[in-house]
Amino acid sequence: MSSNINIVEAPEGVTGEGFFATKLNDVVGLARANSMWPLPFATSCCGIEFMATMASHYDLARFGSERVSFSPRQADMLMVMGTISKKMAPILRQVYEQMAEPRWVIAVGACASSGGIFDTYSVLQGIDKVIPVDVYVPGCPPRPEQIVDGVMRLQELVKSESVRRRSSPEYQELLASYNIK
């Protein structure tokens, strides 16, 4: 993993090993990216693959997602896995709204991304109809390696995000387009 944080020699007269010269955005982004707490919202077979992803063989904890949260108020990464019916959509939205900022969403699998094989009146054809999605993980169901890759892509996005992006007019406009306050 590359980082924009550089360790340089201390100026003369300053004691110690050295000091960091970097931007606040880089430090906060690095800390956020490597300490994400996932909230699994699993309704189908992708949830089984998530269990394998969290197990010792794939070990998502290596990437800073060690503590799985089952409370939206303590999570910052919502992982939606499986089919979401239209009756379940308001619940998914409520879970998203209960998460504190900054919050990110990964749509895991074909069902969460586009409705999958369930092209019917009762199934939501992609969770991006009710909440904003940051990363899509394809597959039916996706292998644990793909889920890990999706988390790593989200980490890259988080690292590059400005500290103040979440209070920007563009982000507020995005939330307003979903009717989220």
Curated annotation (Swiss-Prot):
One of its GO terms (molecular function) is NADH:ubiquinone reductase (non-electrogenic) activity. Keywords: 4Fe-4S, Cell inner membrane, Cell membrane, Iron, Iron-sulfur, Membrane, Metal-binding, NAD, Quinone, Translocase, Transport. It is an enzyme of class 7 (translocase). Pfam families: Oxidored_q6. SUPFAM superfamilies: HydA/Nqo6-like. It comes from the Bacteria. One of its GO terms (cellular component) is plasma membrane. It is a peripheral membrane protein. Its cofactor is [4Fe-4S] cluster. Its main location: membrane. It catalyses: a quinone + NADH + 5 H(+)(in) = a quinol + NAD(+) + 4 H(+)(out). NDH-1 shuttles electrons from NADH, via FMN and iron-sulfur (Fe-S) centers, to quinones in the respiratory chain. The immediate electron acceptor for the enzyme in this species is believed to be a menaquinone. Couples the redox reaction to proton translocation (for every two electrons transferred, four hydrogen ions are translocated across the cytoplasmic membrane), and thus conserves the redox energy in a proton gradient. NDH-1 is composed of 14 different subunits. Subunits NuoB, C, D, E, F, and G constitute the peripheral sector of the complex. Belongs to the complex I 20 kDa subunit family. This is NADH-quinone oxidoreductase subunit B.
